[in-house]
Amino acid sequence: MASPTMKLNNGLDMPQVGFGLWKVENSVCADVVYNAIKAGYRLFDGACDYGNEVECGQGVKRAIDEGLVKREELFIVSKLWNTFHDGERVEPIVKKQLADWGIEYFDLYLIHFPVALEYVDPSVRYPPGWHYDDAGTEIRPSKASIQETWTAMEKLVDAGLSKAIGVSNFQAQLLYDMLRYARIRPATLQIEHHPYLVQQRLIEACKTEGIVVTAYSSFGPASFKEFNMEHAEALTPLLEEPTIVKLAEKYGKDPGQVLLRWATQRGLAVIPKSSREKTMKSNFEAVGWDMEDSDIKTISALDKGIRFNQPANYFSTDKLWIFG
């Protein structure tokens, strides 16, 4: 079974169901990527900050060497970290990331967060994380503007280092500003999206502007409990939420499939992950069946406006209220 594709605004076809690589441990990452390719996944969503791009590339190489897939059949996504936003830093770090993956180009490259931090040389610490110092106490902003960074991103397309470019964790006002000066429009926006954080107006804004939305953390608090976030622990896990469980029974699916289909049926791409082959295959079936419109609305009504993936939820800071 192949994932259906979504047409990006540059004509590129992007698989609607991909495989996320956040928190995939280095020790198993190569095998996880290889097994995901065997299970049918073709889009892999990585990032500098995940710290596992070398191992991701090893899994891809193994699959290609064994004839399971060709490079051109894969859709590999990566992201620009905050410490590389200065215009002259963008291309060098992309080339490093490509070398880590062992590939010549990305299919899609995103600005990870709309936050510019002071440069940390990869030879000093990589991935650099949010803090300038090794002790993890000092946040140092860079003076790079989003426009400066985006101009450098556009040059990646010109140089053939990425086929498409986009953004992640941006809000509508930043997107509207970008569209005033962008020579190459962002092809996608990647956002935290689950029934506890629907962001429907942002999704509608992207649809109007021809920007495809990719949902991450589709299972909500399940991805964040290990960080001891009180609000993640206080909420009913979405995989156990009575509304979701009831709909899973109604459609003969598991709760994870219901959560993913809620997104894909509304026109979003998804990037779930699992190290278990059974769950890999289950998550891949987030398309090919439909729920009634009333059930889609019932899931959306669970919205609480609760966001998990913001810096202040990971460490104490008064400087990084990105979504304020």
Swiss-Prot record:
Q: Which UniProt keywords are present, listed alphabetically?
A: Carbohydrate metabolism, NAD, NADP, Oxidoreductase, Xylose metabolism
What pathway does the annotation place this protein in? Carbohydrate metabolism; D-xylose degradation
Name the domain of life this protein comes from.
Eukaryota
The entry's substrate-binding residues are: H112
Q: Which reaction does it catalyse?
A: xylitol + NAD(+) = D-xylose + NADH + H(+); xylitol + NADP(+) = D-xylose + NADPH + H(+)
Which protein are we looking at? NAD(P)H-dependent D-xylose reductase XYR1
Q: What EC number(s) does this enzyme carry?
A: 1.1.1.307
Biological role stated in the UniProt entry: Catalyzes the initial reaction in the xylose utilization pathway by reducing D-xylose into xylitol. Xylose is a major component of hemicelluloses such as xylan. Most fungi utilize D-xylose via three enzymatic reactions, xylose reductase (XR), xylitol dehydrogenase (XDH), and xylulokinase, to form xylulose 5-phosphate, which enters pentose phosphate pathway.
Q: Where is the active site?
A: Y50 (proton donor)
- Name the gene behind this protein: XYR1
Q: Where, by residue number, does NAD(+) bind?
A: 168-169, 217-226, 273-283
| Induction entry | Overexpressed during growth on both D-xylose or L-arabinose compared to D-glucose. Significantly expressed during late stages of infection of barley leaves.
Which organism is this entry from? Pyricularia oryzae (strain 70-15 / ATCC MYA-4617 / FGSC 8958)
Task: Extract the PANTHER family matched here.
Answer: ALDO/KETO REDUCTASE (PTHR11732)
What biological process terms from GO does the record include?
D-xylose catabolic process
**What taxonomic ancestry is recorded?**
Eukaryota, Fungi, Dikarya, Ascomycota, Pezizomycotina
Q: Record's family?
A: Belongs to the aldo/keto reductase family.
User: Where does the entry annotate site (Lowers pKa of active site Tyr)?
Assistant: K79
InterPro entries for this protein:
AKR (IPR020471), AKR2D (IPR044487), Aldo/ket_reductase_CS (IPR018170), NADP_OxRdtase_dom (IPR023210), NADP_OxRdtase_dom_sf (IPR036812)
* Gene Ontology MF terms in the entry: D-xylose reductase (NADPH) activity
